[in-house]
């Protein structure tokens, strides 16, 4: 498995609107899916850091960490082989999820310190033989 990019970071925030004001105001980041979130059509809004990186703002009371999980883009691969290898403690997946570049296939794993890491690949990255 090879990591290609950093896709997104999910922050647990107490007040989503206040966080949107901070990231879109003084930091000048582009809001994403805000109206869909306000209409109850999407579970959270995001802000775009770069064409391939976003920060998701997840409304939650503060827990032990303000970071819910990080997401790394990997080269397209067979998730079942990854799961069967026993290399990772798999928490969830494979599942289809939305990210910085659209829909992707993801597996959630736990790192040695208990942090959740989402590993994902995008269908558009598959190279046909």
Q: In which residue ranges do the predicted regions lie?
A:
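Conserved beta-strand in the GNAT
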Residues: 55-58, 108, 118
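Helix-adjacent hinge/juxtasegments
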Residues: 57-60, 64-68, 73
